[in-house]
Amino acid sequence: MSTAVSIALAKERKTNEMVLNDQDKIRIAREYFMRADQGRPDIFELFHDDAEIYFPKFGFGFGRESFLEMVKGFEGSLEYIQHDYDSFTFIPSGDYLIVEGTSHGRMCGKSWAGGKTPGGRFCNVFKFRDGRIASVHIHLDPDYTGEDEARFRWGKNRHW
């Protein structure tokens, strides 16, 4: 391929790429949390088809099917989850956006509330490509309701 053709193709690719500013990334991340909380199937419109996901105890997955597989792991136990949008801290950096916050909800008949109970604090690391989410790594303790307390000996008088 000639140099001129290579340059023309590179320019065309660059034109087709959607460059997001920090506010765009924050808007997409907020939309992700709202759609997730509502269980909306159109959440996938925010992701690349080959998007990478990481969730504790699930590990890494790739693509929409992996995202569904991760969500199905909560079937029968997660009654609801609501992220506390006003608690979010956004830290943009290049193609990345880090979102730290809290959630509240109910699982297996027990409630949790981030900042008040052991479970419910999270930190998500999003990577964006071409205007969509290319990866999301979700960092949290999936023991939302504190069922695993016996293995940790810090006592009950902790600040959440």
Task: Name what the model sees in each region.
Residues 2-49, 154-160:
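Short, low-complexity N-terminal intrinsically disordered segments enriched in polar/charged residues
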Residues 29-32, 42-44, 51, 63, ...:
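Hydrophobic pocket/interface hotspot
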Residues 83-85, 117-123:
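Short, surface-exposed coil-to-beta transition loops
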